[in-house]
């Protein structure tokens, strides 16, 4: 049986063939972890058609050498001269580099070690999730589900957004998460009109809607869900109740639309059309969703501009929203595992407002 590491290396080798390149240089923490399953904050990984080598500094060297599969050769990193020497000794003249992670600070150095380089969107290599990645994401979602179940009962009038946000953070760790996958968004009342509102000392009131967007990390992989709950039993705003129903309609339609025959933009349109053909047409102000994995936002996107087909075993969010200035907002976000026909609704058991 081919190991997951070998499958990932094959993905990179195919990328080399497609771009007629000699090697790919990986400097991002995310892609180093993706390939080696070894977390580190620095290092350079080079993959050729027949070699894989990791240059890593003294903080990680011994641990990496003992942990990482011997398919990947590990060398103590001292200076970039080692990487240049490796390229020269292996006849590497054309490098692929991670345009979505590397900064201009490295441009001169890369030009010095290689005659030619091609910038790629390196997140694309992680679009298809392997079984261990899916399992980690499923576990992260389940931890988030447990917190959401408690959260719905926990929220009470007179609590502040900040207090609720801190409770979410603590509870995610209690339930087995490593840490937040991002700072929780908690927005009550009028604050809900800001999609990325930062929690404040605003007090939760009876009859308000409160949007809670949060997730955790498990074994290096993220979850990301949003629920807009009602505080109490009767909403103060009939318009926001109507908005909730419309967002939920769009959310469910988007979840059901996800499969490998549609592009990200086509799924976005399914959700967007429902809202734009309603009284709330001016209040959906962001994309429908995004990929989730090692990064909280990664490929593929579910947006008006993403015209690639969704790939089997990709993981995406479906998160339509309505945001009405000076009134409030509604967002419902779920995670979906893409399949050829009927995709898997990973967050189906996470409670909703009604």
UniProtKB/Swiss-Prot annotation:
Enzyme Commission identifier(s): 3.4.11.9
Pfam families reported for this sequence: Creatinase_N, Peptidase_M24
The organism of origin for this protein: Mycoplasma genitalium (strain ATCC 33530 / DSM 19775 / NCTC 10195 / G37)
Gene Ontology molecular function terms on file: aminopeptidase activity; metal ion binding; metallopeptidase activity
Keyword vocabulary terms for this entry: Aminopeptidase, Hydrolase, Manganese, Metal-binding, Metalloprotease, Protease
Listed name of the protein: Putative Xaa-Pro aminopeptidase
Record's catalysed reaction(s): Release of any N-terminal amino acid, including proline, that is linked to proline, even from a dipeptide or tripeptide
Gene name of this polypeptide: pepP
Family: Belongs to the peptidase M24B family.
Cofactor: Mn(2+)
């Amino acid at each position: 049986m081919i190991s997951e590491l070998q499958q990932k290396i094959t993905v990179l080798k195919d990328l080399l063939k497609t771009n007629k390149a000699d090697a790919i240089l990986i400097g991002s923490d995310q892609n180093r972890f993706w390939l080696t399953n070894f977390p580190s904050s620095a290092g350079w990984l080079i993959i050729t058609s027949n070699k894989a080598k990791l240059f890593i500094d003294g903080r990680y060297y011994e641990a990496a050498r003992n942990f990482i599969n011997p398919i990947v050769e590990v060398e103590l990193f001292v200076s970039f001269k080692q990487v240049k020497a490796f390229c020269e000794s292996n006849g590497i003249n054309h490098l692929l580099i991670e345009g979505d992670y590397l900064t201009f600070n490295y441009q001169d150095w890369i030009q010095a070690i290689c005659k030619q380089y091609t910038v790629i969107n390196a997140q694309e290599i992680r679009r298809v999730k392997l079984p261990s990645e899916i399992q980690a994401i499923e576990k992260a979602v389940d931890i988030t589900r447990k917190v959401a179940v408690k959260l719905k009962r926990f929220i009470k009038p007179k609590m502040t957004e900040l207090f609720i946000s801190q409770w979410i953070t603590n509870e995610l760790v209690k339930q087995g998460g490593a840490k937040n996958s991002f700072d929780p968004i908690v927005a009550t009342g009028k604050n809900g009109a800001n999609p990325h509102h930062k929690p404040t000392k605003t007090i939760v009131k009876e009859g308000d809607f409160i949007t809670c967007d949060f997730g955790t990390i498990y074994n290096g992989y993220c979850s990301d869900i949003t629920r807009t709950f009602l505080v109490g039993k009767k909403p103060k705003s009939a318009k926001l109740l109507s908005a909730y129903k419309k967002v939920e309609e769009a959310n469910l339609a988007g979840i059901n639309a996800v499969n490998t025959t549609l592009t990200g933009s086509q799924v976005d349109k399914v959700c967007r059309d429902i809202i734009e053909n309603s009284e709330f047409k001016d209040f959906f102000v962001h994309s429908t969703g995004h990929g989730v994995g090692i990064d909280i936002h990664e490929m593929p996107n579910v947006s008006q501009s993403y015209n690639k087909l969704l790939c089997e075993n990709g993981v995406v969010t479906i998160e339509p929203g309505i945001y009405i200035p000076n009134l409030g907002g509604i967002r419902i976000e779920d995670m979906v595992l893409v399949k050829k026909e009927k995709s898997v609704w990973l967050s189906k058991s996470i409670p909703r407002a009604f």
